[in-house]
Amino acid sequence: MTTTSNLPEQADIVMIGAGIMSATLATVLKALEPSLKIVMLETLNDCAMESSNGWNNAGTGHAANCEMNYTPPRPDGTVDISRALEVNTEFDLSRQLWSYLVKTGAIPDPQAFIHPCPHMSMVWGADNVKYLRQRFKEMSAHHCYRGMEYSEDPKQIAEWVPLVMQGRSGNEPIAVTRIVSGADVDYGALTHLLIKSLTEQAGFEVHYLKHVHDLARQRDGSWRIGIRDRGSKAQQTIQAKFVFVGAGGGAIELLQKSGIPEGHGYGGFPVSGIWLRCDVDSMSERHHAKVYGKAPHGSPPMSVPHLDTRIIGGKRSLLFGPYAGFSSRFLKHGSLTDLFRSVRPGNVLPMLDVAKDNWPLTEYLVSQVLQSAGHQFEMLRQYYPEARNHDWTHAVAGQRVQIIKPGTDKVGVLEFGTELVTSADRSFAALLGASPGASTAAFIALEVLQKCFADKLTADAWLPRLKTVIPTYGVDLKTDAEACFSIRKSTASVLNLDYV
């Protein structure tokens, strides 16, 4: 049932935010226990209107195939691929969940949200080529990256990505890696599919135009959620046994409103982004890949430049960027006062400490803000030398709010990943951060289960059903090559992806 008013007085679970994270967790919970009464609250008038929206993110099936920030070089010249392996196998969990939903009919057609798309890394210059060659050597030796290809041959690279090589000087060394089993994902379309399926089930409601302004823990351990209807301005409340905050950049404020001790000292640092977008068919049809470069020094991970195939609403386009910037908004539809309202006595010192220790990031963001349109286009031409200005338009990306938290050996730490903050009594969970984000939504949902519903993960409760939804739950795909190959072949078949 989908409504914009008539809130129930009570629910088992309330989810704040109607993006990919809440939709995924609700889907998993209803699959495990269909009798659960779940209410989802969204302040806007539809789901997936912030970072989950197709044009608000890069849509990379984020498997750490091409993102070089996950594979830093060591001082001895070798490459650390441990973080890449973590992200790589986390994406397998999402593929398994989506395959389950396709097989059960909850998602009628996977091509409504996912398409095969090669993932490529590209560098130029002798030192960078040396790094990529070593990276390929180490990654291709691991079963998780079976099928990875490498080339320094301009002719071969031109066959794979002609737009990237056309018009490029042959004087500078260039190298690429390619994995053909990658994907382009429209997380906005996926969120709509998940919520549509949920609304067809008894015990699920999504309510739009509901702004959560208060969270209060009750004596019995439940939560009273104070809500203002953005249309009628009426005040409403709902009581829930468990609250999940999947509100993107808005999660910081809601974590603070909850008052849980575990959230003390947390703050956020917002980073905005701009894409260049090309909808010219003659261009987009000649580029079939996500080509990732190396991030500029001092830049945040989500600012790695890349030239991507995007398929949104059945329309094929090109995307380049992002160009980072600074906005004090925590959400794209948020307020310019978001950052300032988030400052509390408990987080002001961590925030000041982070500001002091991250001058390269500050300088990078300032340089991006001051960058002219001409400078932005010159960056695109490093990846597409013959790009023409009139073929491209600007598109504003979703806001990314990086985590600022108290450190163990310093006052404040800036983190670029995601983090789940949960209460000691397991009645509250808030998801903070940005990258890798949507692609690991299933992994995050499992983390919520393990931290907040551990008593249900037993053989006589949810565990058998969970292994139907996620067949490799409890299996380490980083070490079990046979299980890795088997599940990837299976999910590729169901999702119409390439398998090597």
From Swiss-Prot:
Cofactor: FAD
Gene3D superfamilies named among the record's database cross-references: D-Amino Acid Oxidase, subunit A, domain 2, FAD/NAD(P)-binding domain
Molecular function as annotated in GO: 2-hydroxyglutarate dehydrogenase activity; L-malate dehydrogenase (quinone) activity
Keyword Phosphoprotein among UniProt keywords: no
Protein keywords: FAD, Flavoprotein, Oxidoreductase, Tricarboxylic acid cycle
Pathway listed: Carbohydrate metabolism; tricarboxylic acid cycle; oxaloacetate from (S)-malate (quinone route): step 1/1
InterPro entries for the chain: FAD/NAD-bd_sf (IPR036188), MQO (IPR006231)
Keyword Oxidoreductase: yes
Highest taxon in the source lineage: Bacteria
Catalytic activity: (S)-malate + a quinone = a quinol + oxaloacetate
Enzyme class, broadest EC rank: oxidoreductase
The enzyme's E.C. designation: 1.1.5.4
Gene Ontology BP term (one): tricarboxylic acid cycle
Family: Belongs to the MQO family.
Protein name (Swiss-Prot/TrEMBL): Probable malate:quinone oxidoreductase
